[in-house]
């Protein structure tokens, strides 16, 4: 437990069943040996182990663990406790009950825009955002001007954590156009910020060029020196504002499953705690960072 893979391992092995319970997943696959479709069962199990069971463990190492100052890390590594905060970058300002909302009709005079983090072997992430101008909702709820709502998303993965679907950029753009026609009929979607890497030229052609041919254009994101840290601080500020109801905040519609799955548990960088760990599944976070730093 603890570290970049904490949330994935916990969701995969720890949460589904008590320790020692064998989980079985059955699927039908083609067997090259028999030339038939057959049921294959995959198994997985979480088995608790303790350092006390290892007679060869150096007691100096145990003393080192007992002197860890971070109580969550100490409990994780000494007791094998998975039900601890895993060093999340926003865990202290995130509250699912506050920040995750059921979708509502976007007022006509609110701005709708989108942000984009490109990926091929790793996931890409498109986020659609509604920005409040202070106009109340039909049910009377009112949010401060410039409050941002992540209202929809498109996440390019293959079903495995942090693995992309290798979708062509032109096909991504075509799907964006299709979804915008479905999600926001008769509304204008303002082009928003994207990963600046999409403007890199390859044989005179860029990903941005391919997407523009399909009618999807972007603005450049702020990737200036220090922007990663500024982005994290701005996200924390917006989430805290939403909790305290003290100013423009940030909320996420409950249909944005990948944002909810990946962003609240993103760990801090162990070498630079003012940033998130960039080897984690941070793609929805990155498109969010581009959006909230967009001026």
Go through each PLM region and give its residues.
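Mg2+-dependent endonuclease catalytic cores in nucleic-acid-processing enzymes, primarily RNase H-like
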Residues: 139-277
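Short loop/turn segments immediately following beta-strands, especially the blade-tip
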Residues: 18-19, 131-136
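Short beta-strand scaffold segments in enzyme catalytic cores
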Residues: 124-130, 289
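Hydrophobic/aromatic beta-strand patches that form the interior of the parallel beta-sheet core
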Residues: 45-47, 114, 193
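Acidic, Mg2+-coordinating catalytic module of metal-dependent nucleases/exonucleases
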Residues: 275-295
């Amino acid at each position: 437990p603890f570290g970049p893979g904490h949330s994935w391992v916990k969701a995969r092995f720890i949460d589904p069943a008590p320790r020692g319970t064998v989980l079985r997943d059955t699927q039908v696959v083609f067997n090259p040996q028999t030339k038939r479709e057959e049921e294959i069962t995959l198994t997985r199990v979480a088995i608790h182990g303790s350092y006390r069971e290892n007679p060869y463990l150096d007691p100096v190492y145990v003393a080192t663990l007992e002197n860890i100052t971070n109580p969550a890390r100490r409990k994780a590594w000494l007791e094998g406790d998975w039900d601890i905060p895993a060093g999340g970058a926003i865990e202290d300002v995130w509250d699912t009950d506050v920040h995750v909302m059921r979708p509502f009709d976007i007022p006509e005079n609110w701005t709708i825009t989108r942000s984009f983090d490109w990926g091929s072997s790793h996931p890409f992430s498109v986020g659609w955002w509604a920005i409040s101008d202070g106009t109340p909702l039909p049910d009377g709820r009112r949010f401060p001007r410039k409050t941002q709502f992540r209202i929809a998303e498109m996440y390019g993965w293959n079903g495995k954590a942090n693995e992309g679907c290798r979708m062509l950029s032109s096909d991504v753009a075509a799907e964006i156009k299709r979804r915008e026609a479905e999600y926001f009929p008769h509304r204008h979607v303002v082009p928003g910020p994207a990963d600046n890497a999409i403007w890199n030229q390859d044989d005179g052609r860029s990903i941005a060029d391919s997407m523009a041919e399909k009618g999807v254009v972007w603005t450049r994101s702020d990737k200036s020196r220090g922007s990663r840290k500024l982005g994290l601080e701005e996200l924390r500020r917006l989430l805290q504002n939403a909790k305290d109801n003290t100013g423009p905040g940030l909320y996420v519609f409950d249909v944005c499953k990948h944002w909810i799955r990946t962003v609240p548990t993103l760990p801090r960088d162990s070498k630079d705690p003012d940033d998130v760990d960039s080897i984690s599944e941070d793609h929805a976070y990155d498109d969010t960072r581009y959006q909230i730093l967009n001026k």
